[in-house]
Regions:
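His/Asp/Glu-rich mid-to-C-terminal helical/loop segments that flank catalytic regions of hydrolases
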Residues: 1-2, 110-149
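Metal-dependent peptidase/peptidase-like ectodomains
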Residues: 7-108
């Protein structure tokens, strides 16, 4: 089974994701969690395919999956691979990582108009959003079909 869920209250203490992991009756069955933050921005104008790809270091297959899928499916992404095992930042993936649930987290770094009136839809790189979405679909496919964990 695949569960799609959306959280609220991230920036005031991860309220939604914390509540979910504290009350979810099937936490032991969760194989992984995908998180997306600001995936449509071009924060490196010289590299519009840039994306930061955090994943749980104890699961190196997560990094290899993306490398293989970029090559196999021609995804137009230039990932900065960042394996890690300690929750960082204030994003919802931390709620899951603290429960020892492996995570994959797509991010495109900060930008000058973060939380500002100028943060408008015309600044979104829709090609990047599409390629990250395709990669995420393949992540979910791999997670759902992975037998080793």
């Amino acid at each position: 089974n695949v569960v799609f869920a959306f959280w609220d209250g991230e920036e005031i203490g991860l309220l939604g994701s914390k509540y979910f992991v504290q009350t979810c009756p099937f936490i032991p069955q969760i194989k992984g969690y995908l998180n997306f933050d600001m995936i449509g921005r071009n924060n490196k104008p010289e590299n519009p395919q840039h994306v930061v790809y955090f994943y749980t270091e104890a699961h190196p297959a997560f990094g290899q999956w993306l490398k293989d899928d970029i090559k196999r499916y021609g995804l137009r992404l230039d990932p900065n691979y960042r394996p890690w095992d300690k929750p960082v930042g204030g994003s919802d993936n931390g709620s899951f990582a603290r429960k020892d649930i492996p995570i994959i987290w797509y991010h495109t770094d900060g930008h000058p108009d973060y939380h500002q009136p100028g943060d408008e839809a015309d600044r979104i790189n829709y090609d990047k959003v599409m390629n990250i979405s395709r990669a995420a679909f393949l992540n979910v496919w791999n997670l759902a079909n992975e037998k080793t964990f």
